[in-house]
């Protein structure tokens, strides 16, 4: 809850003359901004697991802010297919829901000098939420990197996001895919990456291996993302 005051107070979440010295966000509590303000320090009390996590915040962030390996915003839900595509980006604007990928769990986030935006549109199809509550009928991201439709007892916490699809879609589970905005297909060919460093990710965005060159890698047969290209190893 924000308090708009005429005088300064030594307390959290007090906004005076368009500035908040210490903003504390908690994923068990609702949050709403009636008008833009500047936050000198922001603490976000929510944890993320290793892997992919949904997120929505009232200020601009990049992956360094989020301590993330990558961040991605919603692109599309393929017509007549149970696949949802996200595009990896450098930063995300305020009130735009996104997915952040982590190599390890994080239990708290801190930010400095953030412009906190008025709570307005939090997305369509992929929708952010600043309010804990029911997730019945909404598609939430699971630990197996699929979006699953919530049942009667499904709940969500604040500062997360979910998919909302028409009932006619029928699908109870949707798979997750990522693109870097340049290469979206699977390249079934020999690809040279030269002598530059190589990073190998699973299709779910988890880092599998790193090497100084392809010759140093010993991968099992499968599909991988290698230096932002999808590659089949046979």
Model-derived segments and their meaning:
Residues 78-86:
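Short linear interaction motifs
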Residues 4-66, 87-187, 232-234:
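A short, polar beta-strand/turn micro-motif
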């Amino acid at each position: 809850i924000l308090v708009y005051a005429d005088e300064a107070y030594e307390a959290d979440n007090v906004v005076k003359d368009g500035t908040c010295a210490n903003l504390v966000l908690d994923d068990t509590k609702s949050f709403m901004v009636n008008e833009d303000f500047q936050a000198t320090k922001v603490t976000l009390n929510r944890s993320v697991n290793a892997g992919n996590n949904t997120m929505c915040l009232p200020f601009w962030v990049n992956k360094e802010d989020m301590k993330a390996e990558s961040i991605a915003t919603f692109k599309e839900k393929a017509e007549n297919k149970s696949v949802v595509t996200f595009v990896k980006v450098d930063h995300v604007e305020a009130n735009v829901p996104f997915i952040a990928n982590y190599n390890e769990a994080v239990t708290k986030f801190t930010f400095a000098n953030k412009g906190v935006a008025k709570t307005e549109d939090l997305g369509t199809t992929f929708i952010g939420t600043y309010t804990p509550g029911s997730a019945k009928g909404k598609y939430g991201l699971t630990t197996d990197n699929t979006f699953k439709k919530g049942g009667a007892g499904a709940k969500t916490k604040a500062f997360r996001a979910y998919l909302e699809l028409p009932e006619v879609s029928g699908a109870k589970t949707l798979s997750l895919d990522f693109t870097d905005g340049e290469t979206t297909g699977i390249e079934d060919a020999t690809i040279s990456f030269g002598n530059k460093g190589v990073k190998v990710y699973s299709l779910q965005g988890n880092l599998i291996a790193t090497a100084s060159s392809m010759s140093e890698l010993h991968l099992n047969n499968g599909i991988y993302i290698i230096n932002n290209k999808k590659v089949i190893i046979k």
